[in-house]
Each structure stands twice: as structure tokens, then as C-alpha cells.
Curated annotation (Swiss-Prot):
Record GO biological process: isopentenyl diphosphate biosynthetic process, methylerythritol 4-phosphate pathway; terpenoid biosynthetic process
Keyword Oxidoreductase: yes
Cross-referenced PANTHER family: 4-HYDROXY-3-METHYLBUT-2-EN-1-YL DIPHOSPHATE SYNTHASE (PTHR30454), 4-HYDROXY-3-METHYLBUT-2-EN-1-YL DIPHOSPHATE SYNTHASE (FERREDOXIN), CHLOROPLASTIC (PTHR30454:SF0)
Reaction(s) catalysed (UniProt annotation): (2E)-4-hydroxy-3-methylbut-2-enyl diphosphate + oxidized [flavodoxin] + H2O + 2 H(+) = 2-C-methyl-D-erythritol 2,4-cyclic diphosphate + reduced [flavodoxin]
Cofactor details (free text): Binds 1 [4Fe-4S] cluster.
Annotated protein name in UniProt: 4-hydroxy-3-methylbut-2-en-1-yl diphosphate synthase (flavodoxin)
Taxonomy, superkingdom: Bacteria
HAMAP family: IspG
Pfam families xrefs: GcpE
Gene this protein is translated from: ispG
EC numbers, comma separated: 1.17.7.3
GO MF, one example: 4-hydroxy-3-methylbut-2-en-1-yl diphosphate synthase activity (ferredoxin)
InterPro entries cross-referenced by the UniProt entry: Dihydropteroate_synth-like_sf, IspG_bac, IspG_bac-typ, NO2/SO3_Rdtase_4Fe4S_sf
Residue numbers binding [4Fe-4S] cluster: 265, 268, 300, 307
């Protein structure tokens, strides 16, 4: 059991970050904000994937003017990402956003920051301070010679101080780097200095394969130490994939469950079915299931029976046939050609039963009532 760090609670619309709330999964739309239909299409896809909070860039006043329409079509908390121009921040706040991502230090004169903070206070909108190694201020680059974890922490604390001086405390902080070791060091150091909730991620992690590994190592390490209240996986791919990877990281640590947890063997000389093909097909076919269930796809007698006994639904294949288990009990025998369809059918039935019963599955192994 991971003991999570205690942080303040910050409300982002109807979703709480910090204060012991479940770790939330975020993503960001990846199109021109002025293309409102496409923005809303991506947001709907993110909602279906389980995204808790979505961020949309507001690089110009023209983009900011689109937020009113985006707000109407968005059913999850909406965050606006603003830099440099305080007027853009005021415009998106008027549109009804739920959180503002800025760095107070790059908004301009103090009176401009005060206007933004006052507008956030009036509307109950929190601010995320987002420090990135790639855009660290010149003063910290001159002090340390290059982006460092210490420089990033100092930058974050500088921005926090600006807001605290204005008696504003609805703050979330992120302190990201594309270097996993640097990101880990920065979050560790920052967590010792503030009790604000932390938004955790590896920025510009890269393409799906390498970026998923970097994110799993970086985000996973920090979460395993009890640090972090919300996460965003940054990948050069469809935003829905970011959400899927985020949930897999949380599931791997037992911090939050959603959808199917696939348990499958890597295959070897003992296996007598095309297990790799079967396991990947099962994963693809079950992406629509949001009820947390453990599904095992095993190919031999060494570990197969044990995993089948522990999983909610399992397939144990051999010699061209498959044995199907539900709750550890064998319920059906099928051919290799039909085993995927049969397994998917049983999983869908199990998920429907759980939803109908009103029970909320948690943790690993058989679902437990909460």
C-alpha cells in the first residue's frame, strides 16, 4: 500500500485534486483551438476514455474567444493554457473555465497579475503554475548554467510566492522535464517545500513507444513514493492514448482502477496456441469496458491454472482449445478459433452484472465492494 503525501484540496469544477482524492488523469487537445468542432470531438473521445480533466491551449485572443462555445460542449472540467497576455486569461475566465494554467512571472507587470488573480478569486478558479525545463527563466539559467532540478524548484517557488502575496492559495504546481532523472529529482525536492497538490508528468516524452516507457518510469517512480495528485502523460500521438497510458500507470501501482487489467504470459516453447495474437486481440476488443476487471490469457500449465484461478475472467489455452474461467471456476470449453469471441462475451457479461449490482470494484484479484 502506497502512503500518499498529504496535500491541500483544490477543486477543479466538480473534480477535486489533492486532499486525499483519487489521482486524476488529464490530457490536452491537439488541434487548432479555433477549430471548435474538432476540439469538441477530441474532448468527447477523451471523456469516453475516462479523462478527468482536459486542457485546451489559448495562444491568441481569437482562440480565447472560442472557449465559450467549447465550454458549452465540454462535460468534464476545462483548463485553459495561457502565456504572456493577461487579457487572454481574463477572456477565458469569462467563458467559464474551471482552471487556469499560467506562470505569473510571464504575464507581465504586477497589476496584470493582480487582475488575473482577482478574476480567478471571484470565480473560484484555481491556477496551475507550470514550470518546464525547456522554458526556464533566464535568471535561473544564468545562476545554474543550464536547466537543473534546483532551478526548476526555485522557479516554481518564485511563482507560488507571487500568488501567495496576493492571498491566493488555490494552487496546483507542475515541474516538468523531458529528462526523467531530472524530473524525479525536481518533484522530490518540491514536495518537501510545499503542500500544494502536484501535477506530475514527463514533458515532451516523445513517440508512443519511448514516451510511454519514459512516462511510466518517471511518473511511476514519483507516484510510488506517494508524491503526486494528478497526472498527464505527454505523447506525440492521439490524446486518447495518453489517457490509456495514464490509467495503466495508476493500475500498475494499485492507485486507481479503470477498465481491463490484462494478465498474459509472454509465450514460449510450451505454448500450443497463437497466444501473442490472442492476447493482443483480447486487449483491443475490451477497450470499451470501464469496469475494473482482471482478465488472464494464459498458454500453458505452468502458470495458467494459478492465474486463471485468481482472475475475474480467464482463458487457459492449449492444443487448439481453450478453457474459460469465471471467478476461478471453469465454465466453458471452446476452440482456438472461437476463444477470443467467447472470452469477450464472458467479460462483457461480467461487467454488465457488476454495473447492474451497483458494486464498485477496487484493487486486484476478485472485485471487492466499496
Amino acid at each position: 500500500m502506497i502512503e500518499r503525501r498529504k496535500t491541500r484540496a483544490v477543486k477543479v469544477g466538480r473534480v477535486q485534486i489533492g486532499g486525499g482524492a483519487p489521482i486524476t488523469v488529464q490530457s490536452m487537445t491537439k488541434c487548432d483551438t479555433r477549430d471548435v468542432p474538432e476540439v469538441l470531438r477530441q474532448i468527447r473521445a477523451l471523456e469516453e476514455a475516462g479523462c478527468d480533466i482536459v486542457r485546451v491551449a489559448a495562444p491568441t485572443m481569437e482562440a480565447a474567444e472560442c472557449f465559450k462555445e467549447i465550454r458549452k460542449g465540454c462535460n468534464i472540467p476545462l483548463v485553459a493554457d495561457v502565456h504572456f497576455d493577461y487579457r487572454i486569461a481574463l477572456k477565458v475566465l469569462e467563458a467559464g473555465i474551471d482552471k487556469l494554467r499560467i506562470n505569473p512571472g510571464n504575464i507581465g507587470a504586477r497589476w496584470k497579475v493582480e487582475e488575473v488573480v482577482r478574476a480567478c478569486k471571484d470565480r473560484g478558479v484555481p491556477i496551475r503554475i507550470g514550470v518546464n525545463a525547456g522554458s526556464l527563466e533566464e535568471e535561473f539559467l544564468e545562476k545554474y548554467g543550464y536547466p537543473t532540478a534546483d532551478g526548476m524548484v526555485e522557479s516554481a517557488l518564485k511563482h507560488v510566492a507571487i500568488l501567495e502575496e496576493l492571498d491566493f492559495h488555490d494552487i496546483v504546481i507542475s515541474i516538468k522535464s523531458s529528462r526523467v532523472d531530472q524530473m524525479i529529482e525536481a518533484y522530490r525536492k518540491l514536495s518537501e517545500k510545499v503542500d500544494y497538490p502536484l501535477h506530475v508528468g514527463v514533458t515532451e516524452a516523445g513517440t508512443p513507444f519511448a514516451g510511454t516507457i519514459k512516462s511510466a518510469v518517471g511518473i511511476g517512480t514519483i507516484l510510488a513514493e506517494g508524491i503526486g495528485d494528478t497526472i498527464r502523460v505527454s505523447l506525440s500521438t492521439d490524446c486518447v492514448e495518453e489517457v490509456r497510458v495514464g490509467y495503466e500507470i495508476l493500475k500498475a501501482l494499485g492507485l486507481r482502477t479503470r477498465g481491463i487489467n490484462i494478465i498474459s504470459c509472454p509465450s514460449c516453447g510450451r505454448v500450443q496456441i497463437d497466444l501473442v495474437k490472442v492476447a493482443n486481440e483480447v486487449e483491443r476488443r475490451l477497450q470499451h469496458i470501464d469496469v475494473p476487471l482482471n482478465v488472464a490469457v494464459m498458454g500453458c500449465v505452468v502458470n495458467g491454472p494459478g492465474e486463471a484461478a485468481e482472475a475475474d475472467v480467464a482463458l487457459f489455452g492449449g492444443k487448439g482449445v481453450g478453457m474459460l474461467y469465471v471467478g476461478g471456476e471453469r465454465v466453458r470449453k471452446t476452440t482456438e478459433e472461437e476463444m477470443v469471441e467467447a472470452l469477450v462475451e464472458l467479460v462483457e457479461q461480467k461487467a454488465a452484472e457488476i454495473k447492474a449490482s451497483g458494486r464498485v470494484p477496487t484493487g486486484y484479484g476478485r472485485h471487492e465492494e466499496r
